[in-house]
Each structure stands twice: as structure tokens, then as C-alpha cells.
């Protein structure tokens, strides 16, 4: 299967000539590409007939269904919903990326990553530049996210709110714990105690 994945890279270089809205809309490039291919298919139908025309009609129907299912005709509202959740709306959608501070760019990158609705997301310190209300929004978003995400964070309150598993590196090994950060601490302490007893 074609697994779509992405990573919040806080040091990524962005195209400063784009506005915030143009950059965020880039999350849907695959849909804009699909629309172009659908338009080209419609144009070609005038030269088709019989079985070839039937196949083209069926294909165009599937493509149109994909656009409808993905909310292609409501992208503006979709972008603004996520952007406002993370406070990006206050930056101004027509603001050039080049005018943003480092922290503001990270917020914009996080917004685009969420809009991309990937199969796997890796979020590196996603709360670094967010206000409390925007962190709360992100918590609700991730708790409703039906696909896979991994979070690297020093914000233990945030980890408690969004974690279903904790992965730790212990004694040179990678270990997976069920539950949130508080549960991890309890299990980790028990394991450390057992480890010390085994080697005494």
C-alpha cells in the first residue's frame, strides 16, 4: 500500500515567496493534480466513442468521487479551521513566509502537516511555540486522529494527554510501554528496580 508519512522538521527551509495560505494549500497538491487530470480527461472525451468512452466516463466518475470525498471544494474552510486551532490565523493568510519568525514558521509547518492527513506523522516537540489554548486544541485533534502519530516531547503534561504508548531507551534497548507518561514512569521504575535486583 502507498503509505503517506510526514515529519515536523523545525529546521526545514520554506519558500519565503509564498503566502501562508499558498503554503498551507500545498497540503492538497495531490488533489489539485487530480483535478487537472480530470479536466484533461473530460477534454479527451470528445474524441472517444464506444467502449473507450465508457471507460473514460467510469474513470472520471471515480476521480470526481475522490475529490468530493476529500472535501476538495471546501478546502478553504478546512485550512482555516486547522489554522485557527493553532493560532496561525492571527498571522494573516496573505503574509509572506519570509516575514515570519522561526517560531511562527514552525506553527505554519505544523498546520500544513495536520492538513495533509497523513497515514503516519512524526511530531518533534510540537508544543514548542504554541499557547496553552492552541496546545489544548492540538490535544483534541490528536485524540481524534484515526491514523498513526509519534510524538517526541519534553512536555510531560502534553504526553500524558495524547499518548497511548511510550517508547523508552533503557540499558541500550528500546522498550514499549502501554499507557500515558505517568503510567510509563510507574512501569519504568518497577523495571529499573527489577534490573538492579537481577544484577546485585
Where are the predicted features?
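ABC ATP-binding cassette signature C-motif
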Residues: 1-199
